[in-house]
Structures are given as structure tokens and as C-alpha cells.
UniProtKB/Swiss-Prot annotation:
Pfam families: PRC_RimM, RimM
Keywords for the protein's UniProt record, in alphabetical order: Chaperone, Cytoplasm, Ribosome biogenesis, rRNA processing
Subcellular localization, as worded in the UniProt entry: Cytoplasm
Domain notes: The PRC barrel domain binds ribosomal protein uS19.
Species of the source: Christiangramia forsetii (strain DSM 17595 / CGMCC 1.15422 / KT0803)
Keyword DNA repair found: no
Coiled coil: none
Name under which the protein is recorded: Ribosome maturation factor RimM
Quaternary structure (record): Binds ribosomal protein uS19.
PANTHER family to which the protein is assigned, alphabetical: RIBOSOME MATURATION FACTOR RIMM
Length: 175
């Protein structure tokens, strides 16, 4: 299984006990959804390696305390710290029609209320305080905050996102 077929679930941030348990910092708004998993994919040397879970439960809200099969010692767990954890895309919970996962809208056309089609979403930048649509049009990049005030409608059937941008924002990029 490749990373493109998976979604990022979190990162192993610490060992927990001398029995090989680890703490996984979950990158989700609903960590309780992931307490009953049978296995996860852990990134090692650019490969995704399946690990079966013996037991897991939430620890301090967004941390998942997990015991993997074949990880028996503190030293084994130490080797896993910093590794990214993934699950197959098929395990993503279904969302209501008006909600979306970031990966679902890559390639969608963005239609602005004033300017019409302003390009395609090439990426989502979520490394800032406010996630941004990264849109490309004619070799130029446009950044639009992913804000409920700006997003009018996400149309998954027609692969479009309708936005109402503040005056001057699109002109800033397109001139």
C-alpha cells in the first residue's frame, strides 16, 4: 500500500511503559473514532509497514496509548518514536455532503462569485494557523483562506468549490 492510498493519522511521539507501549499523537478532531483499530501502517524508511494492535485507548484527549504485537520492550518502542502513522483511505469516516477531507478536493476548480473560475486547487496548506487553498491559474499561485465565510459551496459531483472572496484578494494575485 502506498501513501497515496492512505491518510495521515498521527505520529508516534513517546514510549509509555517498559512493556513496549507507545503514545500516538492523533491528527484528528475525533480521536475516539480510532480507539478500536486492529492495525495501522507505520512509516519506516519510506515504506509503510503494518503493525497489529493488541490494545489501545485514549490517553489525555488526543493521544492514543497503543501496544503493538511484537513490540515487547522499551527499546523496541524507542525505535518507533517520530514515525508517522497511516490508515487506508477506505477507513476514513463518511462525511456529510457539505463537508470534505482535504485530499478530496485536490484538482477541484474554484469558482469565485465575482471573478468566475480562478483556477484549480493543487494543494491545501495546513501548516499555518488558518488552512489555505493553494490554487494555480496560468502559472500563478493564489492563496485563499479555508474559512466558512469564504466557502459558499463544495460540489463534489461537479468537482468545484464556490467561494466569495474579500474585495481585492484575487486581484492581489492575478493583477
Amino acid at each position: 500500500m502506498t501513501k497515496e492510498e492512505c491518510f495521515y493519522l498521527g505520529k508516534i511521539v513517546a514510549k509509555f511503559s517498559f512493556k513496549g507501549e507507545v503514545l500516538i499523537k492523533l491528527d484528528t478532531d475525533e480521536p475516539e473514532t480510532y480507539t478500536e483499530m486492529e492495525s495501522v501502517l507505520v512509516e519506516y524508511n519510506d515504506n509503510l509497514v503494518p503493525f497489529f494492535i493488541e490494545r489501545s485507548y485514549l490517553h489525555k484527549s488526543t493521544l492514543l496509548r497503543a501496544k503493538f504485537e511484537d513490540i515487547e520492550t522499551e527499546e523496541d518502542a524507542e525505535d518507533m518514536i517520530g514515525a508517522h502513522v497511516y490508515l487506508p483511505l477506505s477507513m476514513l469516516p463518511k462525511l456529510p455532503e457539505d463537508k470534505f477531507y482535504f485530499h478530496e478536493i485536490i484538482g477541484f476548480n474554484v469558482i469565485d462569485a465575482e471573478h468566475g473560475n480562478i483556477g484549480k486547487i493543487v494543494s491545501i496548506n495546513d501548516s499555518t494557523a488558518q488552512a489555505l487553498f493553494e490554487i494555480e491559474k496560468d502559472g500563478k499561485q493564489i492563496l485563499i483562506p479555508m474559512n466558512d465565510e469564504f466557502i459558499e459551496k463544495v460540489d463534489k459531483k461537479n468537482n468545484t468549490v464556490r467561494v466569495i472572496t474579500p474585495e481585492g484578494l484575487v486581484e492581489l494575485y492575478l493583477g
